[in-house]
């Protein structure tokens, strides 16, 4: 990349900082949830909505982000994404109630949904094709550093300042990024086909209402009538979209995707798999602080081995899948993740805190292997004309499943923890024990789906589609 013009390198730096802001925000908030609950006068059982509101908004907005960038221009959309994300951060810091915080996180999510896919599109347009992989490696590196710094940085800010600062630190970065975007980034546009607005609204309504209905009366305090109405709207919206997309070449996502057996298994497995593993980043810092009495900083530090294990495993995951095949890797990793979550709970309750970093390191390795395998399995057999649509749907499902996973984790805590749960609660350990046992069952369930994957260990078949989808 040293032979790229200076202006292109500066543009890559802008995209990299956008990736960093978005990835940092996904991990820095988890550590601060108990402190937020105390400051806002809320039960920790309700704080999962701070995560759900952001991730669900990202899932809803993802399908529109690429089209908007092509239609309006990458500079305009990337600038808008940074401004919305920064404004959302400011409103989060100023929030005095949980409802205000949740609404501010929705605004953040709109910006976050546009930032990463539009950033990828920008890199594709400003660098030569032969240097695309090197450029993407460069801009995504800060995105890998974000999850590493997030938990510890969140713990430091909460312990030595206040939780408001986990959002305020986005302001200077966002202001500089917005100015640099207007100054340095070209406004590339592309010819676009007509956007399926009706299909987008149907899918958005279905995802949002069903996720809110899942949180239901315990989490949101809504009436039975409202709950039933949300469920009906959600189901009708999804069924209406399926009817709308039938034989519709302009549909947001073609139903032809589901005729591909590998894609169908991979997508369903990815949804159920991430539903389980999406609970862990939310539950771990909450358990460490509320269940074990760790300080926010100590809890944040404990999350670092998990991120290191995940990053380290990415270097060898292709070789592992090539050697053992998708079916063995996915089934073993799924059952292994369920087991390691129980080991983490057992080691913690026995007071062997010095072993926890090692357990979390292995948890990160297993989770990373499973994520990478699910992604490439899902896309590897798609024909070229469906690859882009299939990748977009997979990205949306990934975010949606993590949103549902955090919601389910909050429901489990609420079911076992009743009205309130604090560090001084006598039954806190039992509450988290039952919650983790239930989570382990949910995490293990996708093994039944992955057992149906053809046992193909051919190297070309395993990584061939991955290389084509990255071009």
Curated annotation (Swiss-Prot):
Keywords: Cell inner membrane, Cell membrane, Membrane, Transmembrane, Transmembrane helix, Transport
Segments traversing the membrane: 12-32, 49-69, 72-92, 101-123, 138-158, 165-185, 195-215, 220-240, 265-285, 286-306, 342-362, 393-413, 431-451
GO molecular function: transmembrane transporter activity
Protein name: Putative multidrug resistance protein MdtD
Homology family: Belongs to the major facilitator superfamily. TCR/Tet family.
InterPro entries: MFS, MFS_dom, MFS_trans_sf, Multi-R_MdtD
Family annotation (SUPFAM superfamilies): MFS general substrate transporter (SSF103473)
Annotated membrane topology: Multi-pass membrane protein
Cellular component terms (Gene Ontology): plasma membrane
Pfam name, any one: MFS_1
Subcellular location: Cell inner membrane
